[in-house]
């Protein structure tokens, strides 16, 4: 998977949420794993909360949301803007890794307190489900 693909998958998430949606941002704080993957294989619990077991792994499908920052596999995302339309949120993210810096748009929908759906605004029929990890 190339770096742009990693940026896209890493994010996502969630992105989410920014200063304009504090209640939603609060609801998305924490560690999340892509549907079908085990939290134990992605995260470990530490004295400071959850951390990646191996963040550099190209097989990592997890996200950690702290404040307006989203940590994904190999990249970090900062929520720049957020807009709500019905039950869906769209976010503009500033993304960076050790080599590339860029912007990304992502949309998502909270399905329950422990589950959300991420999709590209241009292709809402293609989505990924994330589940909250509570180790």
Model-derived segments and their meaning:
Residues 17-22:
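Sec/Tat signal peptide C-region and signal peptidase I cleavage site
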